[in-house]
């Protein structure tokens, strides 16, 4: 296997001639509000800071910055067009939430990462167009193209892992020696496995699905989130939940008997009988794609657009609309435009794949948005981790981390999605002494797929790439796997090089 510093990644970008085209080197080197900071600073850098979800990210960071000791936030993106729209809106929202917090926008990755204490990665190689290509390619073979599982997850890994390898190597050189990296980039668990395999032990995988489900179940019980705990085990987007407790008292029976469990939570995607057959362990919502795969594929095919095509169309409309607004001088109009289109995205979440009814998300003004209670999301998980490390106060959260003996069925180095106890020393996965055969069989198979995918990318092995997709439960076909690899490797050879 290649060492990190031996991996050579060539990626094509449309940018000015004569500019370093490595994504971790930035495109234009532009920087906004980059005045010198004096005194003690704690710097958090967001790679992919021009993403559409950035305003939610900066709100959470701004509100939690003081408790976490963060004084400076840098939003970096390789796309100046996105950064100076969504990143600028995010910066202005963050400044309104916390005027004392220093924000900066830049397309220069080295400047963004220099002396960083914490890094959040939320990138999307090949943008929305890549997602559309991945989905349609998979569907043309009759298999699911969802971007975090199966063929779609494999394709996204091809364009995510090489970029993040470059960023991690740059961070190792220029960031603080004890820098922590929170990977939000999908497929989060697989990407985290690839980075940990290469020796980037400062990387933790984060997904907001478990924390979102935790919030739903606490609301179902009518208790504060701080009083409610549960255990998560499995892989990212392939996990189950058990050990439900309020103030230490087991409430599993109450949850299973709750009349609204299958209406008010993500359990609405599953049949109660399936949960009973599964031993009454509650599944992550993405297990819908495994247990109802044919239904998901047929629902997508019967729709006029895939999820990726829907997102691409909405984002293109939003991008054009924001071109007509002076964001610096009319944040209210810019934010209204942003939220109007963002609501369209969220209202369609999981509806194309399941055939379910769309959501109905309101469009708040910027001031209403700032006043609304913060949901935390991805940033909330990262900030809670930072605070626990700083104070030594023990808390629990779900992360993708090396198994390290927590689950005896898997190797110590296997990255798994587990409930961890966080303290001043770091993350400690809680033991999972026994996994029922029904779940264990699926986890083992998908973990083998993940490890083979990582090896295929790092070793540039065509054989391992085909093997990985052949054994994946959502493909399970050698001819289809081979055809998918042939198509994806050609599209993404600018990221992974030539597979042989």
Where are the language model's segments positioned?
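Rossmann-fold NAD(P)-binding glycine/threonine-rich loop
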Residues: 129-197
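N-terminal Rossmann-like dinucleotide-binding module
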Residues: 43-73
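NAD(P)-binding Rossmann-fold cofactor-contacting core
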Residues: 68-89
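Short, positively charged and aromatic/hydrophobic N-terminal segments
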Residues: 6-12, 26-27, 32
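Internal, well-ordered domain-core segments that constitute the primary functional module
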Residues: 167-250
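Short acidic low-complexity segments
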Residues: 102-115
């Amino acid at each position: 296997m290649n060492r990190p510093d031996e991996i050579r990644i060539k990626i094509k970008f449309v940018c000015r001639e004569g500019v370093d085209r490595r994504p971790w080197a930035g495109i234009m080197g532009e920087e906004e509000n980059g005045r010198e900071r004096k005194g003690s600073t704690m710097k958090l850098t967001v790679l992919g800071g021009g993403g559409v979800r950035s305003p939610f990210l900066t709100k959470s960071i701004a509100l939690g910055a003081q408790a976490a000791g963060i004084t400076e936030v840098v939003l970096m993106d390789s796309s100046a067009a996105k950064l100076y729209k969504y990143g600028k809106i995010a910066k202005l929202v963050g400044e309104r939430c916390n005027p004392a917090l220093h924000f900066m926008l830049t397309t220069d990755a080295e400047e963004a990462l220099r002396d960083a204490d914490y890094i959040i990665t939320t990138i999307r190689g090949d943008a929305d167009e890549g997602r559309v290509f991945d989905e349609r390619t998979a569907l043309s073979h009759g298999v699911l193209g969802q971007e975090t599982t199966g063929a779609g997850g494999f394709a996204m890994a091809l364009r995510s892992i090489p970029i993040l390898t470059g960023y991690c190597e740059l961070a190792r050189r220029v960031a603080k020696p004890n820098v922590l990296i929170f990977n939000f980039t999908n497929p989060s668990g697989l990407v985290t496995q690839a980075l940990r395999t290469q020796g980037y032990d400062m990387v933790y995988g984060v997904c907001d699905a478990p924390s979102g489900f935790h919030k739903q179940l606490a609301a179902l019980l009518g208790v504060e989130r701080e009083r409610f705990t549960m255990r998560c085990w499995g892989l990212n987007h392939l996990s189950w939940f058990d050990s439900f407790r309020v103030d230490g008292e087991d409430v599993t029976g109450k949850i299973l008997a709750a009349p609204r469990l299958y209406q008010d939570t993500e359990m609405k995607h599953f049949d109660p009988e399936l949960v009973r057959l599964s031993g009454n362990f509650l599944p992550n919502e993405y297990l819908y794609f495994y247990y109802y795969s044919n239904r998901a594929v047929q629902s997508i095919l019967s729709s006029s657009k895939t999820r990726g095509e829907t997102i691409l169309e909405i984002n293109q409309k939003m991008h054009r609309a924001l071109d007509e607004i002076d964001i610096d001088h009319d944040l209210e109009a810019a934010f209204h435009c942003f939220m109007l289109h963002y609501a369209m995205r969220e209202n369609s979440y999981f509806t194309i794949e399941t055939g379910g009814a769309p959501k109905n998300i309101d469009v708040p003004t910027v001031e209403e948005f700032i006043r609304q209670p913060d949901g935390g999301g991805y940033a909330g998980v990262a900030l809670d981790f930072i605070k626990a490390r700083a104070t030594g106060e023990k808390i629990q959260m779900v992360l993708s981390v090396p198994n390290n003996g927590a689950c005896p069925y898997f190797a110590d180095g296997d990255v798994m999605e587990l409930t961890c106890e966080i303290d001043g020393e770091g993350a400690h996965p809680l033991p999972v002494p026994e996994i029922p055969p029904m779940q264990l069989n699926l986890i083992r198979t998908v973990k083998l797929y993940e490890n083979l995918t990582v090896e295929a990318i790092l070793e540039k092995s065509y054989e391992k790439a085909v093997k990985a997709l052949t054994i994946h439960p959502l493909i399970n076909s050698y001819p289809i796997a081979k055809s998918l690899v042939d198509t994806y490797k050609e599209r993404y050879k600018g990221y992974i090089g030539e597979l042989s």
